[in-house]
Amino acid sequence: MKGLLTRREFGTTIIGSLAALPLLAGEKSKPSVFGGTQIGAQSYTFREFKLDRMIEAMVSVGLSSIELWDGHLNPGKTSEADFKTVRKKFDDAGIKVGAYCVNFPVDSKDDYLDRGFNGALLLGTNVMTASVQKSIIPRLDQWCQKYKVKLGIHNHCFSDKWFKGDRTKEFETPNDYATALKGASEYLSINLDIGHFYAAGYDPVAYIREHHDRIVSLHLKDRDKDAEHSHRRFGQGATPIAECMQLVKKLKWPYVANIEYEPDPKDPTPAVRDAVEYLRRVLS
C-alpha cells in the first residue's frame, strides 16, 4: 500500500450501509484458482469503493478470494452481527475471505485486538495481515496464540517519497522479518509484498524459495526499475511477478496471492481485470 498513514488511518466512511441491497441472485464470481494457486485481491485496491460496489467489481473480473482491509471493515466499529452480515455478502457472491487485514496501532487496547482477531474468525478465516510497527509484535504474537490465528506482517519500501517516519520502527528488510520471528510462535508469519520488496532492493523469488513455509499472504504489484519504482500494470514493470508465481505453483504454496493495485483508485477495475488475465496466463 502506498503510505502507512493511508493504510492505517484511512477513513471508514466507505463501508457504507451493511443493509444495502445484495447482489442479484446467481451473481457469483468464477473461481480464481489458476494452476492450483488461489488468486485474490487486497481490498485496499478498491479503497474508494463501498463494500457492495467492490463485491460487484470482484465478481465482474472473476476473483473468488479477498483479503479484507480494515478501511472497509473497521473492527472497532463493527458488531459481531455485522461481521456475519459481511461474510454472508461475500459468500453469496462466491468470494471467500482469505484473510482479514487490521493495521493495529502501537497503542491498541486489548479490546481492539480482541475485536480484530475475533472478527477474522467471524469472517471465516484464521489468517490476518497487518502493517504495523515492530514494538507491537510481541503483543500480536500473544493474540495469535490466544485465537490460533496466523498473522502475516506486511513490508514496505521506505525509500518512497511519501515516507516521513522512522524506518527502524517498520518492516522492510529480510533482517526485519528474521528479528521479529526469532523466538516467536508458529502463528506469527509474513505477508510479503513482492513489489515493495523488489523496490527496496531485495529478491522476492529467492526470499519466497527460502521462507515460503512462513509466508501466509502475498501481495502482488508490479513496480518498475526507474528511480521512483513506479507502479505499473501487471507485466509492464520490473517486479518478477511471473517468476514468483511460477515458484509458488511449483511449491504448491497453500495460501492466497492477492492483487494489490495502487494506481487508479477511483476505478481500478480495468487494471485488475488485466492482472487476473496476466496471472491466469502465467500460471497456466
Predicted ranges, named:
Residues L68-T85:
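Glycine-rich, proline-tolerant flexible connector loops at the mouths of alpha/beta enzymes
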Residues T45-R47, D70-H72, N103-V106, Q133-I136, ...:
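Active-site-proximal loop/turn and secondary-structure-junction residues that shape catalytic pockets
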Residues H72-N74, S159-K164, D226-H231:
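A short acidic, helix-capping loop that chelates divalent metal ions and anchors anionic groups
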Residues I14-I15, A20, P31-V33, R53, ...:
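Active-site acidic/histidine proton-transfer and metal-coordination neighborhood
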Residues K2-G40, R47-G62, P174-L192, Y198-S284:
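Histidine-acidic metal/acid-base catalytic patches
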